[in-house]
Structures are given as C-alpha cells and as structure tokens.
C-alpha cells in the first residue's frame, strides 16, 4: 500500500496547519528551505507526545537549488515509505512554491534510490492524498488581481491563483464574501473550511472528484468540478466559444481586457495564421501567457490520432465540422470587477470577419504579435530562486 502524501501550500498560516496535521500518530512533516546559501531539509514527528526534529544541510546537485530540492524530496518520500512508524507524509511548501509541479514530479520524475528500490517515480511508493492551501482572504484577492512580479519573473498572481486552484482543501482566515465567491469558482472541487480546527475532518470528507494531485491538460473540460455559473455580484464566470479563428493582431489587442478585474482566464485558441496548432491561453491577475498545446486532431496523421486520449477524440467527433474539423476556441474567464459584456464583445470583434473567412489563403500572412513560445528548460522543477516554473515566453509576456 502506498503512503499518503499531503502537500501544504500558501502564504499564511501554513505552520498552524502542518502543526495540526502533525498531531496524528505516524505523521512526518518534511520541509525544505533555501536561505540564499544552503538548502536545508527539516523533518518533524511526534513520538509519545515528544516532538522529534532533524535538520540536514544538502549538497547542491549540479549547482542547482531546484534540482537539489527535487532530488532530495523524491528520494526521501520513497525512503520514508519503508519506515514502519510512518503512516502519512506532510510536505510543507515554501510560501511561493506551487503544488502542481511537485505533484507532477512525484508521478513522473524517475529517481534512483539505491539497492532494494526499483528505479522509477516516487509514485511507486507514495500517492498524493490531498493538497491543502492556506488563504488569507484579505491579502489573497488583491494579490490575485494584481500584476506584481517575483524576483524569478513569475507574477504574484500566478502563484496565489495556482496554489488555490490546485487545492483539494482551502483553509481560510479572514473570510469575506467576495473572496469566497471567487474561490468557489476557481476551485469548485475543493472543500472550504475556516481555521485549522476542522482540517482533519475536512480531509476525511473530500469530494470524490477532488484533484488529489491530478493535473488538467489544455484538452480537458474547462469547467471541471461544476463551478457556480450564476453571477455573485461582481464575481462571475464568462464563457466564450467560437468556430472561426481569431485574427492574431486583433486578439493581441483584445487580451488587454483580460488583465484588469480578472482573476483567471483559461482557454484553447484557434489562430488563423497557425491552423495546425492548438494555442493555450492562461492568465492570472495582470499576467498572461500563450503557448502551443500541440496539434488539432484535424491536422494530425492517422498514426498520431491513435495516441490521442479517447475522451478528446470523442469530444472532437461530436463537434467535427467540415472543412475545419475540431478547430475551435473555448475560453472561461473568472471576473471580479471586469464587465463580462465588454470581454465578450472584444473577443467577438477579434474573430475573422465573413470577408476574411472567405480568403483562407491570406491567413498565413497575418502578422503574429505573440512571438515564439517554448518550455522553460526546467519547467517541472524550481528555478534558481527555489520556485517552480511553467511555460515561459522569450518574446511575449504580458
């Protein structure tokens, strides 16, 4: 049986949550911190009511902080699994760490532990049981609507939105109605509780469809978890869909409306000048990025389609329209202050006109202001600042 792992993320009150979880017999808390000079790993457990702690300084792997933390954590998870007195592992994340890439690494990054351990990911021995994110609502909402940047180039909103969105349990302090309305739509699969007293109870009653470390892809449903679709004051989910492509320059101008009064935008885009590529747009607060998400099925050879997820193929069959196949745009925009009508009108105006649709031979000549996007070389692990990176654009980042 695999050992359950709980990740605790957030900006505030994570110490209280890990302290509450530590009280259960058999729980080990693991924490990594980089002080600018040394990576330190700390573990804590309770034995007959006595707190037992250890602290170790780690040797840098390849001179890289991120590699050091990743390699040590993944190996440590597998070793802790073998200990008879360990029934649960709690990973206490640094404040600006995002849980999604860590869960991905647990499931996919191959590690070599040593004699007696088969090579493979940590998921051979452990499973992500839950992600707990601590949210101080008074601070969280302004951070998640803002455009402040961290030293590593990510925006504050990218982290705070990502931490909350990926949670199975949201632990709130200073809850207020607007922030709660946003969180219910941002993380509809998560349970919400106030304070730390009921954390264990909430973890025991997670929804059956909770993430538990599973990552959405650009091709999964955008409204997974059935968020509330009715507006709650200035908070609402705006849905936009289209079966004709965007003009890249007009879309580039329109996305400015997604950077003010918007918490989160996610969506698949069909750009006229990139007929083969699914473009993925994602925003958090005042930051936005676009990246390629592979080919449309209509642009694939039969041998490529055979390897595509069955759910995506079935969805494509339902919406297939000659001559464009499964090409489409589908977006969801979580607004908190922005005018939904303005957003929909701007996106509609960015679509090709009837005259432009009649001249597909011209589409490839459209100027593309979005630039060349690529994966950061260490996209699944923290960079030198000790944080995790995602897709990053060398030319266009808003």
Curated annotation (Swiss-Prot):
Q: Which SUPFAM superfamilies match?
A: Hypothetical protein YjiA, C-terminal domain
**Keyword field contains Ligase:** no
User: Any idea of its EC number?
Assistant: 3.6.5.-
Positions binding GTP in this chain are 10-14, 67-71
Domain named CobW C-terminal is located at 235-351
Show the NCBIfam families listed in the entry: hiber_recruit
Functional description taken from the UniProt entry: Zinc chaperone that directly transfers zinc cofactor to target proteins, thereby activating them. Zinc is transferred from the CXCC motif in the GTPase domain to the zinc binding site in target proteins in a process requiring GTP hydrolysis.
Under which name does UniProt file this protein?
Answer: Zinc chaperone Rv0106
């Amino acid at each position: 049986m695999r050992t359950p792992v709980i990740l605790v993320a957030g900006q505030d009150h994570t110490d209280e949550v890990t302290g509450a979880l530590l009280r259960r017999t058999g729980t080990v808390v693991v924490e990594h911190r980089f002080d600018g000079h040394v990576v330190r790993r700390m573990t804590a457990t309770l034995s007959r009511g006595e707190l037992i702690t250890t602290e170790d300084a780690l040797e840098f792997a390849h001179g890289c902080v991120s590699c050091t933390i990743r390699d040590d954590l993944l190996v440590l998870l597998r070793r802790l699994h073998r200990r008879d007195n360990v029934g649960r592992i709690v990973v206490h994340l640094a404040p600006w760490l995002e849980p999604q890439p860590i869960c991905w690494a647990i499931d996919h990054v191959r590690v070599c532990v040593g004699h007696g351990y088969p090579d493979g990911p940590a998921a051979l021995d452990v499973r992500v049981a839950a992600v707990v994110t601590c949210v101080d609502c008074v601070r969280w909402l302004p951070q998640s609507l803002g455009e402040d940047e961290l030293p590593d180039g990510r925006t504050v909103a990218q982290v705070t939105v990502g931490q909350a969105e990926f949670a199975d349990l949201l632990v709130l302090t200073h809850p207020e109605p607007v922030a709660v309305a946003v969180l219910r739509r941002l993380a509809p699969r998560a349970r919400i509780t106030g304070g730390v007293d009921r954390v264990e109870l909430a973890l025991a009653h997670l929804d059956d469809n909770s993430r538990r470390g599973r990552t959405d892809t650009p091709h999964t449903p955008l409204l997974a978890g059935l968020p509330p679709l009715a507006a709650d004051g200035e908070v609402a989910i705006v849905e936009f869909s289209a079966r004709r492509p965007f003009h890249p320059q007009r879309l580039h101008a329109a996305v400015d409306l997604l950077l003010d009064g918007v918490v989160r935008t996610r969506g698949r885009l069909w750009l006229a000048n990139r007929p083969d590529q699914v473009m993925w747009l994602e925003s958090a607060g005042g930051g936005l990025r676009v990246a390629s998400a592979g080919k449309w099925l209509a642009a694939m050879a039969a041998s490529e389609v055979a390897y595509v997820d069955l759910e995506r193929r079935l969805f494509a069959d339902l919406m297939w329209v000659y001559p464009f196949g499964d090409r489409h745009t589908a977006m969801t925009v979580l607004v908190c202050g922005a005018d939904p009508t303005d957003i929909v009108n701007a996106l509609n105006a960015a679509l090709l006109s009837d005259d432009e649709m009649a001249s597909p031979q011209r589409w490839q000549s459209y100027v593309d202001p979005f630039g060349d996007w690529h994966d950061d070389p260490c996209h699944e692990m923290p960079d030198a600042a000790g944080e995790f990176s995602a897709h990053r654009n060398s030319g266009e980042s808003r």
